[in-house]
Amino acid sequence: MKVDKETIEYVANLARLRLSEKEKEKLALDLESIISYVDKLNELDTSKIIPTDHVIPIKNVFRDDEVRDSYPKDKMLMNAPEKEDGCFKVPKVVE
């Protein structure tokens, strides 16, 4: 498939890119190459291929979400430079 100059300018505008003429020509060639490759992939017979979500078996490796004991609030605030109403007091970051 031939990628014309208007398509390159449209895509560049969507991506908010300013391209020189040389960059537009290179991008056109690159996109043509990519589209050609995808066209070849579309020609493959995948009727006997089982659809998968992942090519490798993946399982959830997160731990169970369970309630656990934590430090008492007074112990955590013991070394705080500043505290207020049982909470850490930190400098204002956003106006």
From Swiss-Prot:
One of its GO terms (biological process) is glutaminyl-tRNAGln biosynthesis via transamidation. It holds the Pfam family GatC. GO terms for molecular function: asparaginyl-tRNA synthase (glutamine-hydrolyzing) activity; ATP binding; glutaminyl-tRNA synthase (glutamine-hydrolyzing) activity. Signal peptide: none annotated. It is an enzyme of class 6 (ligase). It comes from the Bacteria. InterPro entries: Asp/Glu-ADT_sf_sub_c, GatC. It catalyses: L-glutamyl-tRNA(Gln) + L-glutamine + ATP + H2O = L-glutaminyl-tRNA(Gln) + L-glutamate + ADP + phosphate + H(+); L-aspartyl-tRNA(Asn) + L-glutamine + ATP + H2O = L-asparaginyl-tRNA(Asn) + L-glutamate + ADP + phosphate + 2 H(+). Keywords: ATP-binding, Ligase, Nucleotide-binding, Protein biosynthesis. Its EC number is 6.3.5.-. Belongs to the GatC family. Heterotrimer of A, B and C subunits. Allows the formation of correctly charged Asn-tRNA(Asn) or Gln-tRNA(Gln) through the transamidation of misacylated Asp-tRNA(Asn) or Glu-tRNA(Gln) in organisms which lack either or both of asparaginyl-tRNA or glutaminyl-tRNA synthetases. The reaction takes place in the presence of glutamine and ATP through an activated phospho-Asp-tRNA(Asn) or phospho-Glu-tRNA(Gln). This is Aspartyl/glutamyl-tRNA(Asn/Gln) amidotransferase subunit C. It comes from Acetivibrio thermocellus (strain ATCC 27405 / DSM 1237 / JCM 9322 / NBRC 103400 / NCIMB 10682 / NRRL B-4536 / VPI 7372). The lineage of its organism: Bacteria, Bacillati, Bacillota, Clostridia, Eubacteriales. The gene is gatC.
